[in-house]
Amino acid sequence: LTGVRPVKYIRSIYETRDNAEEYLRNSLLVSDKKIRLANDVIRIQKPVLDSLDLRKISLYISIPFCPSRCSYCSFISASGEGALKLIDDYFGLLLKELDIYADIVKRFSLKVDTVYIGGGTPTTLSASQLDRLIDKLGEFDIANIREFTAEAGRPDTITEDKLRTLKNGGVRRISINPQSMNDSVLEAVGRRHTVKDVCEALEIARKVGVD
């Protein structure tokens, strides 16, 4: 019994077999302790899963660019001046792709429940690009979504104009990621900002009034 979500498989066994625990114990060799643990997880998950509306979807928008690449990073992203030259072309294609998905959402009567703008570093985009992106998201009817979050992970990409653009567009939460509050560590891992930059970015966020 392996995988990142083994309980999902166990739940399917309970739904299709009368002798589920016997099958888990004798055929899959799951210990009694793990069966009890799985049962506890299933019991806790059930009210949440039962409440899910399959017509509600989450929209993830990837901005796979960073001003520089951190030495520990395992995410797919592009950095450096050569890569940053691709932003305009990527952004234009992203808007076209959002048009396609907006049409799919309408055609199948889906409802966007949450929006997450991630990366990379979305605040690598200019304030005007962020404004165009949020304007495009208006085609999805996001007025009453449950969550609208944008990563602002690199303090050296944060400006007041960008955060005001995000807030005015409906973004309720941002993430500012110091990674370390030690300048020597930041330099060692390739972050192009200082602890002072982090503090200034947090002050800008407070001033703008975004969480």
Question: What are these model-predicted stretches?
Answer:
Residues 2, 15-59, 108-109:
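N-terminal [4Fe-4S]-dependent radical SAM core
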Residues 13-23, 137-144:
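Generic structural signal for short, solvent-exposed loop/turn connectors between secondary structure elements
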Residues 60-62, 118-119:
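Residues at the beta-strand->loop junction immediately N-terminal to the Walker
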Residues 62-77:
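Local cysteine-cluster metal-coordination motifs and their immediate loop/turn environment
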Residues 77-211:
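Conserved non-cysteine loop/helix-boundary elements of the Radical SAM core domain that shape
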